[in-house]
Amino acid sequence: MYAIVRAGGRQEKVSVDDVVTIDRVAKEAGDTLNLEPLLVVDNGKVVSDAAELNKYQVTAEVLGEVTGPKIKILKYKSKTGYKRRLGHRQKYTQIRVTGIAAK
């Protein structure tokens, strides 16, 4: 059984016990997170109807917060000597899917 869920503006394919990195969510480590399923596949049966999906719930446990790779930004204007160098590291939340079940 697996599900496609919406997490942080993106779609992720998850199954039970998967560890997934999603955009940052304001939750502490150990908290429970409920994700919205967009599609559920259960033993070859595909469920994508909105009325049927309301019967399913995907739960996950928050493992912690991690940072992504550093992105380097350089602004430059020719003939003026203007240079500006910036860096950014995006924060992500790591979760473990604990269950995909009907309500």
Swiss-Prot record:
Keyword terms of this UniProt record: Ribonucleoprotein, Ribosomal protein, RNA-binding, rRNA-binding
Report the GO molecular function annotations: rRNA binding; structural constituent of ribosome
What PANTHER family does the entry give?
50S RIBOSOMAL PROTEIN L21, LARGE RIBOSOMAL SUBUNIT PROTEIN BL21M
Q: Which InterPro entries match?
A: bL21-like, bL21-like_sf, Ribosomal_bL21, Ribosomal_bL21_CS
Organism from which the protein derives: Thermobifida fusca (strain YX)
Q: How does it assemble?
A: Part of the 50S ribosomal subunit. Contacts protein L20.
The similarity comment for this entry is:
Belongs to the bacterial ribosomal protein bL21 family.
Q: Which Pfam families match?
A: Ribosomal_L21p
Superkingdom assignment: Bacteria
Report the function annotation for this chain. This protein binds to 23S rRNA in the presence of protein L20.
One GO term of the biological process aspect: translation
Q: What's the protein name?
A: Large ribosomal subunit protein bL21
What NCBIfam families does the database record attribute to this sequence? L21
Gene Ontology CC, one term: cytoplasm
